[in-house]
């Protein structure tokens, strides 16, 4: 199985084949999901103490917090795939 690793800032690397969605943390439902996953022990904070700019949902049910913007992360994914991924905004949500 091929594992695609992408740098998500400050020395943190994420396996992108496990990612379901990337979202900004600004909405109330996303903030609620972050709090619930923190209490259940499914939250992975990769911000290194910086402001959370992206919330990454994985297929294992874990929630990953990143200090890079969703556009930056998908841009790095696009570069690693040779430009094969074209992220676009649909209803203010980033879709691959």
UniProtKB/Swiss-Prot annotation:
Protein family membership: Belongs to the RemA family.
Source species: Dehalococcoides mccartyi (strain ATCC BAA-2100 / JCM 16839 / KCTC 5957 / BAV1)
PANTHER family assigned to the protein according to its UniProt record, in alphabetical order: REGULATORY PROTEIN SSL2874-RELATED, REGULATORY PROTEIN TM_1690-RELATED
Top-level taxon of origin: Bacteria
Protein name in UniProt: Putative regulatory protein DehaBAV1_0033
């Amino acid at each position: 199985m091929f594992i695609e690793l992408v740098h998500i800032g400050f020395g943190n690397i994420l396996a992108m084949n496990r990612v379901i969605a990337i979202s900004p943390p600004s909405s109330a439902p996303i903030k609620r999901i972050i709090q619930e996953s923190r209490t259940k022990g499914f939250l992975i904070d990769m911000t290194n103490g910086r402001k959370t700019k992206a919330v990454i949902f994985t297929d294992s049910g874990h929630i990953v917090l990143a200090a890079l913007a969703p556009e930056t992360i998908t841009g790095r994914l696009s570069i690693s795939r040779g430009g094969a991924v074209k992220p676009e905004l649909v209803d203010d949500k980033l879709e691959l």
